[in-house]
């Protein structure tokens, strides 16, 4: 199996003169059945890169949709780096080789490709990759830095079809997520010249020991603000952060393999993916 990747090495720079949002045009118009999306948040610690990886693998290997991941979270490039680590483990691990062989025989899906780039070049490099490799993804997932002042982040948001904002029951994270969503809604979603159509919030890292009434209270506040909230709530699970290990102890978050069936059900990643697909169909 060949791994497609395209690298752009130029580092990002802080924005000194942000682009005028009113002049952003929909130069990358959506084609039928093809969406640009991003799991994004201003605050760290909500697992946006981990969620991007889990969703990419679930959609690609289980739902059999063609997925492209654009890793522009400079300088970490955590998804690209994870793919590199996993390929190194694969070289010396017959168990994972067997799992991949079985997965390919069932799904017919090769590895989803990852493009490593920077936010200011993200969409252009994704389009170049698709053209050069003749790869037509149905879903392109962009993993962007959490800092909106990073050059190209706002412009890339404007070229998405939909943004999904994870949040957890932490006052600082919630306030940041709600403020972030409201600003993007006013400046991007409500601008008819811009491609971005919707922003959806969803709960992650839900502690099952917390009272359901607490989240219901938060849900009411969010809806009063006029922000769309997804039904799926993701519980906290340590396997969200567990990559492939050389000892072969289970599959949680992997770029090479679909998450295990038990983990998929327990983590509700499958529920989240299918709810996202349903929402995308309404755009």
Give residue ranges: language-model regions.
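Inter-motif core of Ras-like GTPase G domains
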Residues: 151-171
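Walker A (P-loop) phosphate-binding motif
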Residues: 27-65
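Extreme N-terminal, non-catalytic leader segments
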Residues: 1-42
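Inter-lobe coupling/hinge region of RecA-like P-loop helicase motors
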Residues: 241-273, 277
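Conserved C-terminal guanine-recognition region of P-loop GTPase G domains, centered on the G4
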Residues: 177-193
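Generic structural signal for small/hydrophobic residues in well-ordered secondary structure
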Residues: 44, 78-79, 161, 180, ...
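Beta-strand-loop-alpha "switch" segments that mediate conformational coupling across diverse proteins
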Residues: 205-254
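P-loop/Walker-type NTP enzyme "switch/lid" segment
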Residues: 40-46, 60-140
């Amino acid at each position: 199996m060949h791994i497609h990747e395209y690298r752009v090495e130029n580092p990002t720079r802080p924005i000194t003169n942000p682009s005028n949002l009113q002049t952003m045009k929909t130069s990358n118009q959506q084609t039928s059945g093809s969406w640009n999306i991003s799991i994004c948040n201003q605050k760290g610690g909500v697992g946006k890169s981990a969620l991007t990886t889990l969703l990419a693998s679930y959609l690609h290997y289980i739902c059999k949709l063609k997925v492209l991941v654009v890793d522009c979270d400079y300088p970490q490039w955590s998804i690209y780096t994870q793919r590199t680590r996993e390929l190194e483990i694969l070289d010396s691990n017959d168990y994972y080789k067997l799992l991949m062989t079985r997965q390919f025989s069932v799904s017919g899906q090769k590895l989803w490709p990852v493009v490593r780039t920077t936010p200011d070049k993200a969409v252009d490099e994704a389009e170049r990759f698709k053209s050069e490799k003749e790869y037509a993804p149905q879903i392109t997932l962009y993993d962007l830095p959490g800092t909106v002042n990073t050059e190209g982040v706002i412009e890339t948001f404007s070229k998405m079809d939909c943004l999904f904002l994870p949040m957890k029951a932490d006052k600082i994270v919630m306030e940041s997520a709600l403020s972030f969503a409201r600003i993007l809604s006013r400046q991007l979603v409500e601008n008819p010249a811009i491609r971005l159509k919707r922003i959806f919030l969803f709960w992650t890292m839900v502690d099952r020991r917390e009272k359901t009434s607490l989240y219901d209270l938060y849900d009411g506040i969010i809806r009063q603000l006029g922000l769309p909230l997804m039904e799926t709530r993701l519980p906290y699970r340590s396997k969200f952060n567990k990559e492939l290990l050389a000892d072969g102890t289970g599959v949680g978050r992997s770029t090479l393999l679909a998450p295990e069936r038990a983990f998929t059900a327990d983590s509700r990643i499958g529920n989240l993916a299918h709810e996202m697909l349903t929402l995308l169909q309404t755009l």
